[in-house]
Amino acid sequence: MSIFTKVLLATDGSEGAQRAVEIATGLSTKLESELYLVYVAREHPYLHAYHDLRHQEEEERFKSEDEQMLGESVKYVRKAGGAVTESYLRVGEAANEIVELAEELGVGLVVLGSNGRARIRRALMGSVSTSVLRHAHCSVLIARGYDPSSEHARPPGKILVAIDGSEEASAAARVTGEIAKATGSEAHLVYAMQEERYRPHLGPEMWEGWQEGFEHAKRSARSWVEGQAEHMRSERVKTVESHLLLGRPDAATVWLAEEIGAGLVVLGSRGLGGMKRILTGSVSDSVARHAHCPVMVVRKEMR
């Protein structure tokens, strides 16, 4: 049984959305998930203020263009070797419509582009993807920085998962393992230690033996990370590498993803802060904003 029985792909015809189509098609095919597609059209309030023939024709033209865009997206999925179970045309605020449809369908994963039609800097995400990431009931994959021609874009690529011992991170590791097995990708596990958590703050007399204690903590952490990697290998993931880094979890994850040429970063929805929602400034939110490649944020309960 697939880890995601249903995948919802949100598209708007932009370059970022085309990247999302490539990824959603590949994942749903490899994981044997049902793929649903939604195109959200903008409302045109001024049309509702008039009821003459000219504005009625204008409204019909917009609807025809939106239906054409939806149809083109379906064709693109099929051309990429995928199959669309059902497609939907919604009208309204994009993020709300995507989140509501995901809930209605009971999907396990939403895939969408990072910035819609606007060209913006790498450190920013579009308002739609940000809102969906924060409010969706399910896991979300932001297709940022994806290059279909890259050697890392298609399997065997490299998947980096950030772990910290939380239940959410464990769920992210399980998803990583399943995707790696299905696609033949390498799996990389990273745990980031924050040195300041171990450094004494009560005066020079407390520093005696601190370095020795910190080295012991690093050895224990390295052993734990390798143990997690070994567990993933026992689940028949062919290639698994473990990494221990010093620094903030978000910065360390973003750096390592670029260093190894990861094609996907996976992490849990809470991170180290114990937050119930993904909030601005959290590990998950920061990685989703700054990573060079697609980022999947996994909710603990998967469908």
Model-identified regions with their sequence ranges:
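Structural beta-alpha unit
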Residues: 1-3, 16, 75-110, 230-265, ...
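Intrinsically disordered or low-complexity boundary/linker segments at protein termini
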Residues: 1-19, 82, 109, 131-174, ...
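Gly/Ser-rich helix-loop-strand patches that form or flank binding pockets
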Residues: 3, 26-30, 95-149, 255-303
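Residues at the starts of beta-strands that form the adenosine-phosphate
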Residues: 6, 32-36, 84, 157-158, ...
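Short, well-ordered secondary-structure micro-motifs
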Residues: 20, 47-49, 123, 153, ...
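General small-molecule cofactor/ligand-binding pocket signal
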Residues: 36-38, 85-90, 141, 190, ...
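Acidic, proline/glycine-rich short linear motifs
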Residues: 39-68, 192-223, 303
